[in-house]
Amino acid sequence: MDFNKIEKKWQKYWEDKKVFVAENGGKKKPYYILVEFPYPSGAGLHVGHVRSYTAQDALARMKRMQGYNVLYPMGWDAFGAPAEQYAIKNHIHPKDAVKENIATFKEQMKDLGFSFDWTREFSTTDPEYYKWTQWQFLQFYKHGMAYKDTIPVNWCPTCKSVLSNEDAAGGVCERCGSAVVQKEKSQWMLRMSDYSEDLLKGLDDTNFAERVKLGQINWIGKSTGAHITFKIDGHDKKFTVFTTRCDTLYGATYCVLAPEHKYIDEITTDEHKEEVLAYKKACALKNDMERTELNKEKTGVFTGAYAINPVNGKKIPIYISDYVLASYGTGAIMAVPAHDDRDYEFAKKFNIPIIQVLEEVTGTPHDNENKKNSIVAILYDETKDKYLTINWQDKGGRLFVGGTIKDGESAYDCAVREILEETGYKNIELVHELPKINHHYYAYNKDKYFNIESTGFLFKLKNYEQDSQKLDDDEAFDVEWVDRKVINDEIKDELHAKTYQYAMNPGAMCGDGIHINSDILNGLNKEEAIKKMLEWLEENKCGEEKVNYKMRDWIFSRQRFWGEPIPMINCPKCGWVPMNEEDLPLLLPDVAEYEPTENGESPLANISDWVNCKCPKCGHDAKRETDTMPNWAGSSWYFLRFMDAHNDKEFASMEAMKYWNRVDWYNGGMEHTARHLLYARFWVQFLYNIGLVPNKEMIWTRVSHGMVLGSNNEKMSKSKGNVINPDDIVNEYGADTLRLYEMFMGDYQQDAPWSTDSLRGCKRFIEKVIRLKDKAIDKDELTKELEVIQHKTIKKVSNDLTSMAYNTAVSTLMILANEYDSHEFTKADYRLLLTLLNPISPHITEELNEALGYEPLCYASWPEYDEAKTVESEIEIGVQVNGKVRGTIKISVDEAEDDIKEKAMADENVKRHIEGKEIVKVIVIKGRIVNIVVR
């Protein structure tokens, strides 16, 4: 068969008959399927596009057969940096580049037989479309949701444009990969942070995949804590920090401000000004990722100023450090080095006090415990790489040196004394004092319960000089040097095991426990202490409970040509004034020079005829905004426009939006979870709040697909030479084979490597389906003997296509085809196979169906299964004689046990093996086997 000829034939048929055109209204139930509309790059469609588009196309085709009015539209996300950079690289105007690339994409999509409703096609670059993007921006502005502010922004020196936080994730430009730097610029912003809680709550009204929900939850980054106000010693200034652990305030021994903090210049003392200024300049050259990298060396500079810890009145130094960002939280932190790794490293480097205010609790509390303070001392022999232990055998097992601190004795002196008394070693050197632990235990040698506060120490042995032990009468143990394996295997006591853990990982104690060194909080657990500290802060008017969100406002300006012009005018008398809505769209001027400028301004700033205008409010000479919108603007609402694509009175009528209700099934990349999808949800929630859309969430199900990798499991790229061009595959194997293979290649939600062998296997399957046509008996009735497998297949394929299990849907169809190949089957049976395969491989199934004389499958009904018929009514089981299989019998699934025994004994081969022998017993294991025991 000529696959290409067949495919062109049916593509023309579908287009001529307008098979896939969706109507707004009618008796059919609406179902809206959407795949992210692509940026039409110069490279054309790739096999990753084919995977996601085929998956949604299969769902759309099945839903149409099930009687739904399916909207499956396609358009073009063509504004923004990608199109502009392609145009610059190829010396072509973005408008012309987009037009050419769209034509290529569209031809490729049609060649693959995707059932898009092309009557609703549009591009974000169409003035008829971006008129409404501009109109919606004006609604943001008029409702106080759009504002202009001078802020530190992410700047890409290569693209010469501002990037949103989402576009600069990881500290690099999402588009070109260049390192992002910080710049102060005046930018249009949307108050997206005002919607943080609504965006979190709105997830409950969606059916998003769990990993998609989690991605959004993490990006929004809600945390509940407290704002605490610190006075600056010698100044009338105050600053606020946000912390989730206000209960650790007693342990705050310094504060850190972002280098950009507004008070830095004012509070820095004269002797520190030069160093602080140099540090600030160095920070300005770093991006956020570089500044907050956890593994980098901690840097900072003392300002010479001090803050007052509000809970104890102590003066604590104020530093600046690059790991604190002005754009996150309040731009200031309180540091509790005993309980935060980063604070601990910083404190160690700058010799800042470390005060432990939490101690972990080990052991089990008991009544009538004796209280005392004690130590656990770990002695390490560097030469032999072994640790000193005390082995109490069955009276307590293996432990480290431990003991009670005497009155007037320090914990350190106690540790030295106990090592000497219990082991005789006297030449030791302190390595670390370890965090205190609150421990409950039973002392075997004293037959008492104790609650102790234990201080741990790690020492190293300087030499082997040893005195005799000084032991109490009840102390009987062996002193043994052991390696780490023995310690890990044999030290079971919680206190000693925890002390060893601290010794192996010295630093901050980041777990929870009870409070110490905390005055009013001593002895309280985390929850109790937070509650009490919040009450204290509010009573003393130096803090309050606060919910914080990581998500910032949306940076909405771009210093580029190829984007929607922002419809705002700057008047020297009136300030910023919105354009009159009736004057929209504000068109991009037709210019020859569109490259980004060296001074960081948009190229539009150089077009005086376009920039200069009159103020809509007072008529005075004014200037247009020359920044353009980000490429995310047009994609934030495009799914609404598809509902009513030709409306020139409004972006979409409420009637049309209520009819379609919302997107039932939306497929897109996981990389867009914290960008496009979050922006779109914010945009819709705003429109809902001003009464312009019917639902607060206009997307119900959101799913994501895995990438198609090269055959070596690497990401496809031109530089690696592993890019697969779908045009080549279509020309050699046909669109149906490519579609089938991409659905069969693996779990749809996971990355999958390309395999030409598997592609050929899919071609062989289609060839088998073709061959089966000539075996079909000319009858229009389904074959009774095939009833169970047919109903099983209908059920499996139907469920798989709605749960993204496309690979198992294909394998199920392969099983059905194999079953046909080994049985007699009718035309009706064959058409059933074609119908179930049609959503994935539509062209060849239409052709084979037509050859049988049936109406086209695009008008057919999807087969329904009967649950009762998905269960085998008759099964085959084995018959054993003394454990060896001697025959098989067919039985009904509910056959009586006596009847099963009778059939087993009647089998000819079984008869021969039991003849003349005594039957001891007959065992029937229902549905599996019969075992006859003879002698």
Kindly label every feature range from the protein language model.
Residues 1-30, 273, 351-355, 360, ...:
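Basic, alpha-helical terminal appendages of large translation-related enzymes
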Residues 3-11, 47, 132-359, 832, ...:
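NTP-handling and nucleic-acid-processing catalytic cores
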Residues 9, 13-17, 88-239, 246, ...:
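Residue patterns forming the tRNA-binding/recognition surfaces of aminoacyl-tRNA synthetases
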Residues 23-92, 98, 121-136, 243-244, ...:
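N-terminal catalytic cores of NTP/NDP-binding nucleotidyl/phosphoryl-transfer enzymes
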Residues 77, 142-154, 544-574, 631, ...:
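Helix-rich, typically C-terminal accessory recognition domains appended to large enzymatic cores
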Residues 305-311, 315-326, 611-750:
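Alpha-helical recognition segments enriched in aromatics with Gly/Pro capping
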Residues 360-400:
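N-terminal strand-loop-strand
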Residues 405-495, 505-510:
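Unchanged
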